[in-house]
Amino acid sequence: LYPLYVTYSIFRSRCAACCEEELDDAKLQQLWDAAVRENVFVICKTPMAKQITRRTLAGYRDIPVNAHYFDDLINMMKNKTRQFVDRVLKPSYWKQEGVKAMKFDAVVGNPPYQSMTNGGSDSGRAARQAAPIFNYFVEQAKMLEPGYVSMIIPARWYNGGIGLNAFRADMLNDKHLTKLVDFANSKDCFTTVDIGGGLCYFLWERDHEDECLVINMNSGEQDALRRSLNQYGNLFIRSNKAISIIEKIRAKADSFVDEMVSAIDTFGIPSKVRGHEEYTEGDILLVHSDGANSSKTSYISRDVVTKNAHLIDKYKVRISILVPQNGEAGVKPEKGYRSMSTPHLVYPGQVDSFSYLNIGFFDNETEAENFRKYMMCKLPRFMMRTTYSSAHISQSNFIFVPKMDYTRSWTDSELYEYFGLSDEEIKLVESTMRPMTDS
């Protein structure tokens, strides 16, 4: 339907340029055919898509329709980019006689989002995983050097990840990206489509450089803010309303929790290490993963610890190195996010494996427990969520989580008051995050 919508828009513009008395049926047909012939050029992924495009624009009439398909479109875009661009820019490819070079005013579309690829073996069967491909369409569209590019694509590029890190960096630093309309819930855009992480569409303008107008769409309401997409480096803050919260916290806080968080693999113990069940004098307790949301303990010698031995006898607070539910990409926003697994205390004489990230170290249990409870509050987890770029958690995800006084306990209400959050900002945090309990 995109070719039809574009053609109709051009057709209406042609009609507007004519006197109303001229617009009889013959003239209208002439204007429509001219728009199809002169203004619309379609790249299709399959022969069927090409045939549907022809029928949509011309019906059963024998008129020229500029529609082509590539036998191996995705491979061409991924591995033969220059060849693809050169072919599309050749007038002969489109059978345009007397034209020296093809120049496209705009490239628009709703490209395919992903393809299934072999990802190794799983119990003797080929493992399948979804690889993003929409990014290739955006990149090739820019290479055609049109005046404008506008496409609707999954919003998961905000977080980077496999196949998207370079694309994200390019998009965030592209000053020609002048408008970004964001749908955290895909059903706010396509009512019958549920896409984890939501959707977005954008406007790229070749001859215009400016900050980007970011528009958050939520249940029919919109919030717009003109800002630099790379305001925080390679971290894209999706919510416009979160910007003011970040700035309030940065203005008030003296330091941030990222200073407390250890590097991944605190003690140099691989996830696969399993200790022994019987305690031997001098042993320490190892906490290791036992599948999703589960852990087990065993005993190991202190010699197994190859890093940070001085932290063994501290009180530690640990979380999983993974964001729950594969990055919570499929979580419906209205149900709320957790941002991290439930934090647990790791006592002196205990260590954990690579599966866990230690986010705080303390000399006494009271401060360790107060910090653990603090991290279960909604505001710290909300601040973590604004930084996510993958399903893995690391030090960098705590750069906006303020360090507090842990000789006392904290509640969200106290945190909201301390940082001076407005009612609207509080509502955003409360509606985004789900409560976290120990159960």
Residue ranges and their predicted role:
Residues 1-179, 185-189, 198, 202-214:
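SAM-dependent methyltransferase catalytic region
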Residues 163-164, 171, 193-194, 393-397, ...:
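Charge-rich, low-complexity amphipathic helices
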Residues 102, 186-425:
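C-terminal substrate-recognition regions of SAM-dependent nucleic acid methyltransferases
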Residues 427-439:
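Short, amphipathic C-terminal "tail helix"
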